[in-house]
């Protein structure tokens, strides 16, 4: 791993972060708290610490980067929502299970098997308090009214409801069955019904109303939502403030007697882009930019809560995104903003813009300030890293695709490089990354939202895509035909990984 020193030019808020002496060992006998904040569709180029030309103010994330470590080669296991969330919590690629492409929906059944180990369940066995607050998007077990124990009159639902659910029964198994002591959030993305807040296994308010779909896909730059069931008091604009309030409240309740793990998957800046009034006009990238700025403020509130509770010094705080930004090509010249930096593509794509994500780590007790790592990491690595922090190894059968990056964080020993990393697009297109090389077999397109999505190889031409990311990080030159040995090696390794499912 190559470490690059950078002089901080970002103003650090009134002593918010503590500088750490380079190379000094600060092993604490007390298990650290772990807070994992995962934004939804946040791009690498949105953050000022990655992109000096960003049109969006991100002072809190920039301060975290300056007070800790910034990774430049971090990846989500998928280029879309649900499979990345599966990978984060299980340390396992989602395509090894039943989700081979696409995402879950608001009424999808639980994607993670209750018996499977998760980061939360493993940390719970180590004495941690655990919570998930925010966007779930991994499904619940939803009781069907056809198998109800109560009279239908007890549940008010729209007529001819296509997914009749008895909300008087527990929505279980769900997050609580996967190791989380506490859950508060929404079932899926902010544009997917049912629009309802769930606390542990019950909705706060029954989704007895209906909302119409938004009028335009990119209404004044504000994105869209689908029509469907909703709680009568549900407002899309309230979601980010509400989940932030719950996350801060949960942190405030931690008394220091036990370490805690907070998984905080934000619902933003995924569409619809609905910044509250105080953030409108703060950025120069439309409502999207304003929503990102609001997300940055949310992260600042979490840091403040950690600091006020005396937790910040011994908390491993990670800020990242579930995939690349959904920043379409036309938005780049319109706003002169590159949400995915110079990387090709966007959310959902197999190209780098789909899965190369921001990744910031702050832990004053162990991580030196103002450091940058170019080690390749994947969000599936959270499980192995969290256990490594505690001096524990992965249990048999757990975290199949998880590798610890603790050595990269602490710089106490030379980190072991990831042998290979598998990428996966929304339509199920695979890619394999090994060192500088990235291979995409069988498709000459994006496999996602960018055109062309699918381009089948032609006779006499390349059978896929091969890029050297060191010399060509923007994936502009396909060198498949010039490197047959590398193609063969990577295809063999990918096939071996897939057979390991």
Where are these regions (language model features)?
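Formylglycine-dependent sulfatase
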Residues: 2-3, 7-8, 15-465, 473-500
């Amino acid at each position: 791993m190559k470490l690059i020193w950078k002089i901080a030019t970002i103003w650090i808020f009134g002593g918010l972060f503590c500088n750490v002496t380079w190379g000094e060992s600060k092993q604490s006998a007390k298990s650290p708290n772990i807070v994992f904040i995962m934004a939804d569709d946040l791009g690498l180029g949105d953050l000022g610490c990655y992109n000096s030309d960003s049109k969006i103010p991100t002072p809190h994330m920039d301060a975290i980067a300056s007070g800790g470590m910034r990774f430049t080669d971090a990846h989500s296991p998928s280029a879309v929502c649900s499979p990345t969330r599966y990978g984060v919590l299980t340390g396992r690629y989602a395509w090894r299970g039943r989700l081979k492409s696409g995402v879950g929906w608001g009424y999808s059944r639980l994607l993670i098997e209750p018996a499977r180990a998760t980061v939360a369940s493993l940390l719970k066995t180590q004495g941690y308090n655990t919570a998930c607050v925010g966007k779930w998007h991994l499904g619940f077990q939803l009781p069907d009214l056809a198998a109800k124990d109560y009279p239908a009159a007890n549940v008010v639902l729209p007529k001819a409801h296509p997914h009749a659910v008895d909300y008087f029964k527990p929505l279980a198994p769900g997050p609580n069955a996967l190791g989380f002591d506490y859950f508060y959030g929404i079932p899926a993305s902010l544009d997917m019904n049912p629009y309802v807040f769930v606390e542990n296994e019950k909705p706060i308010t029954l989704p007895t109303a209906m909302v119409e779909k938004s009028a335009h896909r990119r209404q004044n730059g504000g994105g869209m939502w689908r029509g469907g069931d909703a709680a009568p008091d549900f407002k899309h604009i309230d979601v980010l403030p509400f989940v932030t309030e719950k996350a801060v409240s949960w942190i405030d309740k931690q008394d220091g007697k036990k370490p805690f793990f907070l998984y905080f998957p934000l619902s933003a800046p995924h569409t619809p882009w609905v910044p509250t009034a105080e953030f409108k006009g703060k950025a120069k990238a439309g409502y999207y930019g304003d929503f990102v700025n609001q997300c940055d403020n949310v992260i600042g509130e979490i840091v403040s809560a950690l600091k006020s509770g005396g937790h910040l010094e011994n908390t491993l705080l990670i800020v990242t995104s579930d995939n690349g930004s959904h920043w379409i090509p036309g938005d780049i010249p319109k706003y002169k903003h590159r949400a995915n930096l110079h990387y090709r593509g966007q959310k959902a794509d197999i190209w780098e813009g789909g899965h190369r994500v921001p990744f910031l780590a702050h832990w004053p007790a162990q991580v030196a300030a103002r450091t940058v790592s170019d080690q390749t990491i994947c969000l599936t690595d959270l499980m192995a890293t969290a256990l490594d922090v505690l001096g524990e190894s992965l249990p048999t059968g757990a975290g199949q695709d998880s590798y610890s990056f603790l050595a990269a964080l602490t710089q106490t020993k030379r980190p072991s490089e990831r042998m290979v990393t598998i990428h996966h697009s929304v339509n199920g297109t695979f890619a394999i990354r090994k060192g500088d090389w990235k291979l995409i077999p069988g498709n000459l397109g994006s496999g996602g939202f960018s055109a062309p999505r699918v381009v089948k190889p032609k006779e006499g031409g390349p059978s896929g895509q091969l890029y050297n990311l060191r010399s060509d990080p923007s994936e502009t030159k396909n060198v498949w035909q010039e490197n047959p040995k590398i193609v063969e090696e990577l295809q063999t390794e990918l096939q071996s990984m897939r057979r390991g499912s």
